[in-house]
């Protein structure tokens, strides 16, 4: 361990905190999605269009080339045809998609001559809120408020059909990078590479089997091919060329001799190609086989290296590098690669995923254009086509092809390639849950398999991925969240970096082969050349980056051991990086002057990066760094200094005060429940029309806070209240995590909230000119509910605001045309139509007051009504509460204030929790928070409980003593019922408690009678469908065990699906009853006399019917009851 040198500490943790605040002020909290989306609209769309180049219809000497693409401003087309500007709140209220038109320049080419270009709208692209293309971009708080937006809303999501949807980042293995590992079960060593080009992903593996022979697995080839065959197919014919393509190291070459000997039967390129062709197309003529093999090695083998014939040599060298790594691992010259190391991971953000989607959607549009052009040419002939070529091109485009494909994927989350759940409905429970959802990272691994290593916390997650915030259950460790200071790269063009490296003196791989004395240089996973002085080369790159000569996106790492010397330069997108302060000669480059300049606003975060004071490191480069945790720990050996250890946490985990004093799982539960707490989630709740939402009436800022709360905006949008809490067992009503609440506190408004629910109804149009109508239905109409359900409606069929409604009350009266056109002839031959009752009603289990009614139009011009109801939620038995330390519980008793215990100073607690919940869970942080909250309330100041740098416990205890209380937080208490002093002192403090959205009012359910299923005639399932309670197999077994036969009959027959069936005593078949003629007969044997009525479960009758459908004849044998 490095010795601590006599370091002069210029900066304190408070100074570093100012620097971190400068980062959030400039970058925001969802910058990763915004940067990615902006990169997509700036150059990603153009790249995809350039990949296609143009469209070649089946018309002689005619093609259309694609030019520049541009994105318009968000707008929408009214039903009447005019296009109007569109703002996000309009899109939410009117169920529109917040999108902008895409315009593409099309250049017709006739006989090789380019004609006048025409710009055409090719479709609509959903716009990410607060991105460059959004109408909210760069607006002040006042302007946002005028547009109905919450100024604290971070953006980073889309609005599709009125719903807010977020694209969740996907974590994947780095493309185009080789990883080697041992397969112990099959005794193989494998090098894998996921080669990625233009949306196509191909897995190439090189493996060494136990006999020492190397094989290559190629896409679309069923069996592995010998490595030497593939090298010959790529054009390396002599043994010397193949050996040199791998390595100059004699140890490696010696192992390769066996491979060359084993493959000596194939010596020419044609033989090697034919061998691959035979595997891929057995039984086909040689000409086809050769063409197929050439297609495989050009297009499917390592496509990222190129798809032309001239790229084959580069591919051979890449395969040689893969073989070299396999052989080095087999000889013990290198270790296995760790695929969970974050240097080997890349995140696919909104921009990358939209690019994949846009590529597929645009491909469909190009195919459709080709079809439309060819069809028009064939139908209308050459004269029409070339008379007005611009008109011909414009008419061949159907913008809906592109728009609908993109919109459907965003609305459902189903992405090309079979991925599901890519876009999700944005979580709006509270402000923190929204931020957390926008910073979520999900892994594509299967939830069913253990994947222990993938779920584990890895050392390289430090400062990049939150160690605390992950769900419980099957997603544990696979769904993660970004840490506070994570930054994700957007990428630099590789050609620029390659040119820069060549200027620094890199010898290309084609000119000099690697040997043990040279440093191998990899650019984004591809071996590009060799360097003689590795350390000097790496230092030069770092110096140029810090001085601003090259992009700060570039990272470089150097790995050296006895046998392998490698340099990795990374400039690709999707790398998770974190900022660190540079340390030179044992002194941090951040000085007091910098801090003062940040304080007075003359210096920004970006300035510090440009000045070379701070730099971003990816997980690869951090392997070369020695990072000091605190300024006073910096020594000569250190290369960097942490900005703040608390920044390793994510946003919800940062809200937990004193997390370092809790058991790790408790912080995970605390972070999870912070996302379920009620508060002021958004300031524009009066005009929002979310399907459901909660609002706490009097949210408070925590007395024991974390500095990060202010930085992320939690203090403006809090979710919780400060409760006076006593830790006391009280008559057993708070055992098993239950809590006891003070009735008077509840009556004064403690933890009171309102629940909002929005219902919507639309006047739909049907084929044949039929429409829905908003009106008070006529009593004669089919399905009329009864007069009392329509009592609140106005004459237009829409309810009055502030009407009190109960379950099944009608909010919007509506009638619809018949589902099937059963036209009935009325008097005098006039056709009458029987309309149906399809009114919008309140959910059966809910009550409330109509809060607002919005009447508007959809994009199709149909009338749309949205009705929001509100319901006052006063804490009651069974409502769930939780502290920020994962201590959750439900209300077990509500006690009048006069019966509650009180302290010597007359304080009556709001909440009593059981002491048994503390020792086994080790939530010491909650106890320190209680003492801190007590100090804060007595002194009228906030207490800092930030992770690792919070106010020390000793200081808080000392302050309590100065205030005249015991330093332990315990107090003498008196029983509210007897008035006697309690024997033990009771721990009393102030703790920030959160009310969670799990409430009894939303879950309580019972039924006596109600709807049944059509098929089984058994009660429906679930509260929403007024379902019954399931009496399952285990419950049945209990009653059988007790011998309670009558109770069994009651539960399983009388209360469920009892039915009476006529059964023929002669043949045992179910008989038929002809009610019109008043007789019962057996359809099988014709029996009319010996037929009896039998009680049975309808499910049993259904079983009999299904057996008959299978061709099995069940027969019931009847005997008389005794």
UniProtKB/Swiss-Prot annotation:
The protein's required cofactors: Zn(2+)
The keyword Cytoplasm is annotated on this UniProt entry: yes
Catalyses which reaction(s): RNA(n) + a ribonucleoside 5'-triphosphate = RNA(n+1) + diphosphate
UniProt-listed Pfam families: RNA_pol_Rpb2_1 (PF04563), RNA_pol_Rpb2_2 (PF04561), RNA_pol_Rpb2_3 (PF04565), RNA_pol_Rpb2_4 (PF04566), RNA_pol_Rpb2_5 (PF04567), RNA_pol_Rpb2_6 (PF00562), RNA_pol_Rpb2_7 (PF04560)
SUPFAM superfamilies: beta and beta-prime subunits of DNA dependent RNA-polymerase
Superkingdom of origin: Archaea
One term under GO cellular component: cytoplasm
Cofactor binding, note field: Binds 1 Zn(2+) per subunit.
EC number of this enzyme: 2.7.7.6
GO molecular function, one term: DNA binding
Enzyme class: transferase
Record's subunit section: Part of the RNA polymerase complex.
UniProt family annotation: Belongs to the RNA polymerase beta chain family.
Name of protein: DNA-directed RNA polymerase subunit Rpo2
Gene source species: Thermococcus celer
